Amino acid sequence: MANAKQLALFAMLVLLLASCAAARRHGKPDPCDGGGGGVDSHLPPGMRRCSSPAVSEDGTPAVMTVNGFEEGEDGGGPAACDGRYHSDRSLVAALSTGWFAGGRRCHRGIRITSRQNGRSVVATVVDECDSRHGGCKDDIVDTSAAVWSALGLDTNVGEVPVTWSDA
């Protein structure tokens, strides 16, 4: 009889420990972090089709590059979101493959903040910067000259540190 009570007490203790451990994991796992078990978690970061959430309330750290979105410029073909070219005077952006999220951010605004001067601007996502096939690293926000101008930055620099978030 004493063994049965001890066994029951032990079983209850194990269940209590398991429920406490589950309660500590209150946040949703990042499907792109390799440990979250998402559909792309087995792929290296640049090949994932999902989008990691912002890592802080100040936005996701990224590298901003300048791109030509008009026909005949270095941006390549028409934008992935709508199959059209866009004016470099428009506030538009292309995101690395993971952040592009299979097109889920198409035609949505993202807030880009310069880490150099603190200025912010909202740009519309119109394209993907392909980080699966070497076109981009997986931390790129590729923007028009108008975005650089709105942030008070010189396009000749080529790359600047920024943060971005969904607007």
Swiss-Prot record:
Name recorded for this polypeptide: Putative ripening-related protein 6
Subcellular location as annotated: Secreted
Top-level lineage group: Eukaryota
Keyword Secreted: yes
Signal peptide segment: 1-23
Source organism per UniProt: Oryza sativa subsp. japonica (Rice)
GO CC annotation: extracellular region
CDD domains: DPBB_kiwellin-like (cd22270)
Stored InterPro entries: Kiwellin-like (IPR039271), RlpA-like_sf (IPR036908)
Family from the record: Belongs to the kiwellin family.
Region span, Disordered: 28-57
Keyword annotations from UniProtKB, A to Z: Secreted, Signal
Cysteine pairings via disulfide bonds: none
